[in-house]
Amino acid sequence: MYQPEFPPVPFRLGLYPVVDSVQWIERLLDAGVRTLQLRIKDQRDEEVEADVVAAIALGRRYNARLFINDYWRLAIKHQAYGVHLGQEDLQATDLSTIRAAGLRLGVSTHDDMEIDVALAARPSYIALGHVFPTQTKQMPSAPQGLEQLARHVERLADYPTVAIGGISLARAPAVIATGVGSIAVVSAITQAADWRLATAQLLEIAGVGDE
């Protein structure tokens, strides 16, 4: 049963681009995307704070669900919609502080054991990856594939889920067909020959999410 210890999110979050700049956040919000994540890696809080502030302000202006990857203190300070954490960040993060601040929490998983860890934290949503081989980041685990993804989605039938990892425009329909509530994409948009067209096509497949 879906009883998170953090504020809930819609069961279907729809298309969920993960991008590394405020410029991309603004572009995608303007293109109709309503769930996004700002993921800037390996910088100190003071180096990313201005970008976090700007991204959160844009999210508010468009009434969107904007998640901040990793920089949870800044997300709390500036009242983001939510925070996304990887497994490696869970142990080093004060989840009770995020909870008390009223922020939603998303957690990455790569196998059944990590799903168990995520469920123990009772987050707002669980991300399932990586579905396909990905060039976006170095992954210690093997790709899950559609069959494993479908099994995880069935296991988490009451939970908002997000599929991530190597999801292209061509692969997106098969991913959505597993019943997953959202698809997170990176290069399918940011490296597309025509990002506006790619975004529109992905929105057609995954939707903007439930209200």
From Swiss-Prot:
Q: Could you state one GO biological process linked to this protein?
A: thiamine diphosphate biosynthetic process
Q: Which residues form the signal peptide?
A: none
GO MF annotation: an example: thiamine-phosphate diphosphorylase activity
The residues that the entry says bind 2-[(2R,5Z)-2-carboxy-4-methylthiazol-5(2H)-ylidene]ethyl phosphate are 134-136, 166, 186-187
Query: Which cofactors, by name?
Result: Mg(2+)
Which reaction is catalysed here?
Answer: 2-[(2R,5Z)-2-carboxy-4-methylthiazol-5(2H)-ylidene]ethyl phosphate + 4-amino-2-methyl-5-(diphosphooxymethyl)pyrimidine + 2 H(+) = thiamine phosphate + CO2 + diphosphate; 2-(2-carboxy-4-methylthiazol-5-yl)ethyl phosphate + 4-amino-2-methyl-5-(diphosphooxymethyl)pyrimidine + 2 H(+) = thiamine phosphate + CO2 + diphosphate; 4-methyl-5-(2-phosphooxyethyl)-thiazole + 4-amino-2-methyl-5-(diphosphooxymethyl)pyrimidine + H(+) = thiamine phosphate + diphosphate
Q: Which residues bind 4-amino-2-methyl-5-(diphosphooxymethyl)pyrimidine?
A: 37-41, 69, 108, 137
Q: Which UniProt keywords apply?
A: Magnesium, Metal-binding, Thiamine biosynthesis, Transferase
> Taxonomic lineage per UniProt?
Bacteria, Pseudomonadati, Pseudomonadota, Gammaproteobacteria, Enterobacterales
Return the PANTHER family for the record.
THIAMINE-PHOSPHATE PYROPHOSPHORYLASE, THIAMINE-PHOSPHATE SYNTHASE
> Which gene does this sequence derive from?
thiE
User: This protein is called what?
Assistant: Thiamine-phosphate synthase
Species assigned in the record: Escherichia coli O6:H1 (strain CFT073 / ATCC 700928 / UPEC)
To which pathway does this protein belong?
A: Cofactor biosynthesis; thiamine diphosphate biosynthesis; thiamine phosphate from 4-amino-2-methyl-5-diphosphomethylpyrimidine and 4-methyl-5-(2-phosphoethyl)-thiazole: step 1/1
Q: Which Pfam families match?
A: TMP-TENI
Q: What does this protein do?
A: Condenses 4-methyl-5-(beta-hydroxyethyl)thiazole monophosphate (THZ-P) and 2-methyl-4-amino-5-hydroxymethyl pyrimidine pyrophosphate (HMP-PP) to form thiamine monophosphate (TMP).
Q: Which InterPro entries match?
A: Aldolase_TIM (IPR013785), ThiamineP_synth_sf (IPR036206), ThiamineP_synth_TenI (IPR022998), TMP_synthase (IPR034291)
Q: Which note does the record give on the cofactor?
A: Binds 1 Mg(2+) ion per subunit.
